[in-house]
Curated annotation (Swiss-Prot):
Residues 45-60 are annotated as: Mn 1. Pfam families: CFAP107. GO terms for biological process: flagellated sperm motility. Its main location: cytoplasm. Microtubule inner protein component of sperm flagellar doublet microtubules. This is Cilia- and flagella-associated protein 107. Microtubule inner protein (MIP) part of the dynein-decorated doublet microtubules (DMTs) in cilia axoneme, which is required for motile cilia beating. Disulfide bonds: none annotated. GO terms for cellular component: axonemal A tubule inner sheath; axonemal microtubule; sperm flagellum. The keyword Cytoplasm applies. Keywords: Cell projection, Cilium, Cytoplasm, Cytoskeleton, Flagellum. PANTHER family: CILIA- AND FLAGELLA-ASSOCIATED PROTEIN 107, CILIA- AND FLAGELLA-ASSOCIATED PROTEIN 107-RELATED.
Length: 194
C-alpha cells in the first residue's frame, strides 16, 4: 500500500486506520494574512559579528610614529626631489623630453653621437635624461599671443570660442540657387507594374 504521508505508517497502528496524515507544509487557516506579519525574534537591536566580538580598550592611544610613516609613504617624494636636477636653477631646465624629441629632433650638443654599453650598470650610457637641455622652452610665442588676446578688451557682443574661431567661408562657396529643386507632379511618375 502506498501512502502519501510524510512519515510512513508505524506498525503499531491498525491496518483499518488508513487516514492520510497531512504534512506540516499544508496551508490552513488565514495563511495569507499570517504570512505578511513580521515577527521579530528579539526586541533588541541586531548585533553584527564585529560589534559582538569587538573588545574596547578605553586607555588606548594611537601610535603616532606609524601614522607618520604611513602619511609620508602616501605623500611620496617632495617637490624638490621631483623637479630639481643637479641643483640647476629652475629657469634653465624647461625643455621637456617631448619638446626635445618632436620640436628639436633630439638635438643636444652635450651628448656624444653614440652611446656605449656599460656592463657594470647594464645600461647604455650616457642617458638623455641625465643631461637635460639648458635653455628656455620652445613655445613659438604661443603664450605671449594668448596673453595678448586675453588682455585686449573687446567691445560689442560677447562671442563664444567657436564663433570667434570659425572663419567665414568665401562668397564663391555659397549656393546662389534661391528656390528648391523642382519636383515633377505625381501624375508624371510612372506607375509601378507588378
Amino acid at each position: 500500500m502506498f501512502l502519501t504521508a510524510v512519515n510512513p505508517q508505524p506498525l503499531s497502528t491498525p491496518s483499518w486506520q488508513i487516514e492520510t496524515k497531512y504534512s506540516t507544509k499544508v496551508l490552513t487557516g488565514n495563511w495569507m494574512e499570517e504570512r505578511r506579519k513580521f515577527t521579530r525574534d528579539t526586541d533588541k537591536t541586531p548585533q553584527s559579528i564585529y560589534r559582538k566580538e569587538y573588545i574596547p580598550f578605553p586607555d588606548h592611544r594611537p601610535d603616532q610614529i606609524s601614522r607618520w610613516y604611513g602619511k609620508r609613504k602616501v605623500e611620496g617624494l617632495p617637490y624638490k626631489h621631483l623637479i630639481t636636477h643637479h641643483q640647476e636653477p629652475p629657469h634653465r631646465y624647461l625643455i621637456s623630453t617631448y619638446d626635445d624629441h618632436y620640436n628639436r629632433h633630439g638635438y643636444n650638443p652635450g651628448l656624444p653621437p653614440l652611446r656605449t654599453w656599460n656592463g657594470q650598470k647594464l645600461l647604455w650610457l650616457p642617458e638623455k635624461s641625465d643631461f637635460p637641455l639648458l635653455a628656455p622652452p620652445t613655445n613659438y610665442g604661443l603664450y605671449e599671443q594668448l596673453k595678448q588676446r586675453q588682455l585686449t578688451p573687446k567691445a560689442g557682443l560677447k562671442q563664444s570660442t567657436y564663433t570667434s574661431s570659425y572663419p567665414r567661408p568665401p562668397l564663391c562657396a555659397m549656393s546662389w540657387r534661391e528656390h528648391a529643386v523642382p519636383v515633377p507632379p505625381h501624375r508624371l511618375h510612372p506607375l509601378p507594374h507588378f
